[in-house]
Design a protein with these regions (language model features):
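Cytoplasmic helix-loop-helix junction between adjacent transmembrane helices
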Residues: 101-135
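Helix-loop boundary and gating motifs at the non-cytosolic
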Residues: 2-50, 207-214, 218-232, 236, ...
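C-terminal transmembrane helical hairpin of 12-TM major facilitator-type secondary transporters
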Residues: 271-312
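A membrane-interface helix-boundary motif in multi-pass transporters
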Residues: 150-167, 350-370
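A late C-terminal transmembrane helix in Major Facilitator Superfamily
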Residues: 325-354
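Helix-to-loop junctions at the C-terminal end of transmembrane segments
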Residues: 56-68, 152, 257-270, 352-353
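Intracellular juxtamembrane helix-capping segments at the cytosolic ends
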Residues: 109-122, 309-324
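Structural signature of the two symmetry-related core transmembrane helices
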Residues: 71-85, 165, 272-286
Length: 387
């Protein structure tokens, strides 16, 4: 049975993800429309946010472990509210990029704390708790991207700031009730149940290491695709609202993957599933960026979302299926995401800047980087077998 405290934390997670997607993913439409940002500028903005994400998430996990998750969520929500308020006041390109970085710090304090709160003291219920966590944030993200474009067209670009700000205030209003229920839960005597076992203890560390390799590369792909969606939409003559609808399919596919892999656990500690999803991601990444029709774009998105769903699920599940240091592991899990958020768009921007006339050079360079990541995955697996 899920405790009332965890239900409220899942609700906070849902609201937070919707607000985060509404702001961060459609910021690139705002920058393109308001300041004339092209592919290089949008990719560089995404890369800068990714670099901040690495440090903020890593430290966020440590701070959650040291000072408590509830306190850190309060601080993170405060940072998000402050940054979005500044975004409404200062409307130059430079200040908007700085606001994005400040917002990233705030949200990076929230995610590791939420991951820790829903997985702590779960015992044998861990797969269920992580499954609900993944389905919840994926649902918030998918619905957020699907509806954000339409809402922005109706409410105006200013809603990019005030709507997520208002949702974050709602999170702050819910948090005291969640903290009160959590305190009651912690005061109760609970029977410790063992974690879900791997094949052997060595496999636990091996699969955690491999998942921490694969997950950053999945975000290399994601954070290269998202800043380029305004360009894809322009190429296919899609409005902002239609781009949100059409290009949200991969998020719904990821949601379906989370739901399936939550209910079916046969993929736990199975290398073929992790490797196969990595290969599928690479193929569909090229299909996503190089599609010349909406039909091909939709097909590529389905494979893209399914593969990323398993890769992310593996990273979070293996990070939490340990006996201690949940906060630190959650922070490292998020920091690995930040590494991907930085490297992907940085690589794409660099190649577009150096070879601007080459057709599809950004996609090919990042695709090559993904192939390097897959080789690293095989190398880690091979080293384990040989040893």
């Amino acid at each position: 049975m899920i405790s009332p405290a965890k239900i409220l934390f899942y609700l906070i997670e849902l609201i937070n993800c919707y607000a985060a997607v509404y702001y961060s993913n459609f910021l690139f439409f705002y920058l393109r429309r308001t300041f004339g940002f092209g592919e290089v500028e949008n990719l560089l903005t995404a890369a800068l946010g990714g670099f901040v994400y690495i440090i903020a998430a890593w430290q966020g996990g440590k701070l959650a472990q040291r000072y408590g998750c509830i306190r850190l969520i309060y601080i993170g929500c405060g940072g998000v509210i402050l940054s979005l308020a500044l975004g409404m006041i200062f409307t130059t390109a430079t200040t908007q990029v700085m606001v994005f970085c400040l917002w990233t710090v705030g949200v990076c304090f929230i995610w590791p704390a939420l991951e820790t709160l829903v997985s702590e003291r779960a015992g044998a219920e861990l797969p269920k708790m992580v499954g609900i966590y993944n389905v919840t944030w994926a649902a918030g993200g998918a619905v957020g991207y699907f509806t954000a474009g339409i809402l922005i067209e109706k409410l105006g670009m200013a809603s990019l700031f005030w709507l997520p700000l208002g949702l974050t205030v709602v999170e702050l209003a819910i948090l005291p009730f969640a903290a009160r229920w959590l305190k009651k839960d912690n005061n109760r005597q609970c029977h410790e149940v063992s974690l879900t076992p791997a094949v052997c203890p060595a496999d636990t560390k091996l699969f955690l290491r491999m998942a921490w390799i694969a997950n950053p590369f999945s975000y290399v792909a994601i954070n290269t695709v998202i800043p380029l969606i305004p360009s894809i939409a322009e190429k296919l003559s899609l409005s902002t609202g239609m781009a949100g609808i059409v290009c949200s399919l991969w998020m719904f596919a990821r949601l379906a993957a989370f739901a399936a892999f939550w209910q079916w656990t046969g993929w736990h500690y199975r290398f073929r599933w992790l490797a196969g999803s990595f290969l599928l991601m690479i193929v569909c990444f090229f299909g996503f960026l190089m599609a010349h029709s909406i039909g091909l774009l939709l097909i590529a998105q389905v494979g893209f979302g399914l593969s990323i769903g398993l890769i992310y699920y593996s990273s979070l599940y293996y990070s939490m299926n340990v006996t201690e240091n949940h906060g630190s592991n959650a922070g490292l899990h998020e920091a690995m995401i930040g590494a991907g958020l930085f490297v992907g768009p940085a690589c794409g921007a660099a190649t577009l800047y150096l070879v601007p006339t080459a057709i599809g050079i950004g996609a090919w360079s990042v695709g090559g980087l993904l192939c390097v990541g897959f080789s690293g995955l095989l190398l880690v697996r091979h080293y384990r077998i040989k040893s």
